[in-house]
From Swiss-Prot:
SUPFAM superfamilies linked: Carbamate kinase-like, PUA domain-like
Entry's family note: Belongs to the glutamate 5-kinase family.
GO molecular function: ATP binding; glutamate 5-kinase activity; RNA binding
Keywords: Amino-acid biosynthesis, ATP-binding, Cytoplasm, Kinase, Nucleotide-binding, Proline biosynthesis, Transferase
Domain of life according to the entry: Bacteria
Pathway: Amino-acid biosynthesis; L-proline biosynthesis; L-glutamate 5-semialdehyde from L-glutamate: step 1/2
Gene for this chain: proB
UniProt protein name: Glutamate 5-kinase
Subcellular localization: Cytoplasm
Length: 367
C-alpha cells in the first residue's frame, strides 16, 4: 500500500520577501519534488497557504487586512490565481491536481468527515494531487482552523498519512527564535512534545501569514497523536523532502506516538470544536485517566458553556487543565441540575430516564 504524505507550505515560503508576488522558483521547485514523489509511488496532499497574500498583491494592498469580511473577500480573489499558478506548473509535468477547500464544519460533522476521507481516497486512486486550503470565503470565525498548520495536521489524521511536512521560513525548530537570539540552539528530534514545554516558540506568523512556530507545535501534537511522523524544515529548499525520505537528518523530526485510539476517537479529539467544559473532582479524573472509565454525574463539580446533547466538551480537573474530550449525553441546562448526583437520581430530577453516563468511555478520548 502506498504511503501518504501531507506537505504544508506557508505564505512566507510562497511569497517574495522583498517585492510583491509569488516566489515562483520556490513553487516550481516544490511542484517538481511532488511530481518526483508521485513517480516514486507516494500519495501526496499539498496544503497551501497564500490566497490572502496573492489577493492583496492583485489588489495592490500593502498590508494584510484586519477585518474578517475583507480578508475573506481578498482570499476569494487570491485563491483562483494561486490555483492557476499551481495548475500551470503541474500540467507542464503531466500531473493532474484537484482543489479541495475545507472548513472546520466539514470535519466537525461525522458524515461530512467520512465523505471527505472517501473523496481523498478516490483522488489518490485517480493519481491526483489534492491541493487543500481553508475555505476562507465562507468560514465562520468560531469554526475556523485558524491557520493552515492546524489544517494540515487534521488532514494528515483524516487521510491516515505516514508523514506531515511543515515547510516554513526557518530550517528547523530552535530553543528560541534564531533571528532574535544568537544563543538559540537547533532541535533535531523530539520524542515527546512535553520536552518542549520550556521552549519559547513565539506566537506570531509572518507579515502575510497566520502561523508562527507555536501553531506548528500544535500541529505536531495533533499529527503525532495520530501516528504521523512530522518534520519542520525550510520551505525554500523543497528538495529536502526527498533527502528526508531517504533518511537524511534534516529539520526537526517529531516522532509519532503509538496509535492508541481508532479513527472515530481521533475525530472526537481533533475534528470537533468543544462547546463547553466540565470540571471534575479528583476521583473522576483518576477514574478516567487511569481506569478508562466513563464520566458519571457524581464526578462533575462545575459546568462552563452552553451546549446541546452530543456536542463535544472538554473534561478538566479543578485547575482547568484538560484531561480528555468527549461527546456529552445531556445538554448544559440538564447537567446543571444533575451534576454531583448519583446516576439513579437522574430520573427523579429530570423526570425521564436518560443515559446513566454523562460521557461514555466509547465517546471519550484522553488529551
Amino acid at each position: 500500500m502506498s504511503e501518504t504524505l501531507v506537505v504544508k507550505i506557508g505564505t512566507s515560503s510562497l511569497t517574495n520577501p522583498h517585492h510583491p508576488g509569488l516566489a515562483l522558483s520556490t513553487i516550481a521547485g516544490l511542484v517538481e519534488v511532488i511530481c518526483q514523489l508521485r513517480r516514486q509511488g507516494y500519495n501526496v496532499v499539498l496544503v497551501s497557504s497564500g490566497a490572502v497574500g496573492v489577493g492583496c498583491t492583485r489588489l495592490g494592498l500593502r498590508d494584510r487586512p484586519s477585518r474578517i469580511a475583507q480578508r475573506q473577500a481578498i482570499a476569494a480573489v487570491g485563491q483562483g490565481r494561486l490555483m492557476r499558478t499551481y495548475d500551470d506548473l503541474f500540467t507542464t509535468l503531466g500531473q493532474p491536481i484537484a482543489q479541495v477547500l475545507l472548513t472546520r464544519g466539514d470535519l466537525a460533522q461525522r458524515q461530512r468527515y467520512i465523505n471527505a476521507y472517501q473523496t481523498f481516497q478516490e483522488l489518490f486512486e485517480l493519481g491526483v494531487v489534492p491541493i487543500v486550503n481553508e475555505n476562507d470565503t465562507v468560514a465562520v470565525e468560531e469554526l475556523k482552523f485558524g491557520d493552515n498548520d492546524t489544517l494540515s495536521a487534521l488532514v494528515a489524521s483524516l487521510v491516515e498519512a505516514q508523514w506531515l511536512f511543515l515547510l516554513t521560513d526557518v530550517d528547523r525548530l530552535y530553543t528560541a527564535d534564531p533571528r532574535q537570539d544568537p544563543n538559540a540552539k537547533p532541535i533535531t528530534i523530539v520524542h515527546d512534545l512535553s520536552e518542549l514545554e520550556s521552549i519559547q516558540a513565539g506566537g506570531q506568523g509572518s507579515r502575510w501569514g497566520t502561523g508562527g512556530m507555536a501553531t506548528k507545535l500544535t500541529a505536531a501534537k495533533i499529527a503525532t497523536q495520530a501516528s504521523v511522523r512530522t518534520v519542520i524544515t525550510q520551505g525554500r529548499s523543497p528538495e529536502n523532502l526527498l533527502k528526508i525520505l531517504a533518511g537524511e537528518a534534516i529539520g526537526t523530526w517529531f516522532e509519532p506516538q503509538p496509535e492508541t485510539v481508532n479513527a472515530r476517537k481521533r475525530w472526537i479529539a481533533h475534528g470537533l470544536v468543544p462547546t463547553g467544559k466540565l470540571l471534575l473532582d479528583a476521583g473522576a479524573v483518576q477514574a478516567i485517566q487511569a481506569g478508562g472509565k466513563s464520566l458519571l454525574a457524581a464526578g462533575i463539580q462545575a459546568i462552563e458553556g452552553d451546549f446541546e446533547a452530543q456536542d463535544a466538551v472538554q473534561l478538566c480537573d479543578l485547575n482547568g487543565t484538560e484531561i480528555a474530550r468527549g461527546l456529552v449525553n445531556y445538554d448544559s441546562h440538564e447537567l446543571q441540575q444533575i451534576r454531583g448526583c448519583q446516576s439513579d437520581q437522574i430520573v427523579q430530577i429530570l423526570g425521564y430516564e436518560g443515559a446513566e453516563t454523562i460521557v461514555h468511555r466509547d465517546n471519550l478520548v484522553l488529551s
